[in-house]
Amino acid sequence: IDIDNSINSGQVFLWEKQGVDWYGINGQDILKIDKNGMIKSIRNRKINFFRKDDDIEEIIKSISKDKIVKKAVKEYEGLRIFKQDPFQCMISFIISSNSNIQKIKSSLEKITRKFGTKVKIEGKEFFVFPKPEKIAKASIDQIKTCGVGYRASFIKEAAQMVVLKKIDFEYLKKCDYQEAKKNICRIPGIGNKVADCIMLFSLN
């Protein structure tokens, strides 16, 4: 697995390299990847962030029927799709609409600092991603201070839908592609591309 390329590919935004190690926020957890590519959860949770159960050879064989994809697979060997926290992933890609990686990263960092909980590990301070309830209760003006502009109302409504179980990530993981997409596209601010990103990066 090419860790650096995978982290910098635009799937995740709340990761930073400190020395030779990567630290990343994944929902209510902090993940650490060392120089050998070993990953651990600071909360000692069982994680499958690298999707090690996937049959990579079979997936590559299947998608390489397309010539452009085949060339990309060869050029970016070692690139992997991560399995992210669904709520964090959803908010990240609502913010991603009409934006760029630096702006997305900046807004998400502000959201975690404003609404998340501070944790200390290995002498370092981090903020875990806020729970849906925290964002659902925030005012649109409070969310706007995080640099998300017109997306503030989308973020609040998305969080409210999760709290009210109108969006149930565990249910969506069991749905087929069309059914999951239909459900996710009910959230304001989510169209085809954003829905596909959320499904690919967090809902299997």
Regions found by a protein language model. Give the residues of each.
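HhH-family (HhH-GPD) DNA N-glycosylase catalytic core used in base-excision repair
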Residues: 1-204
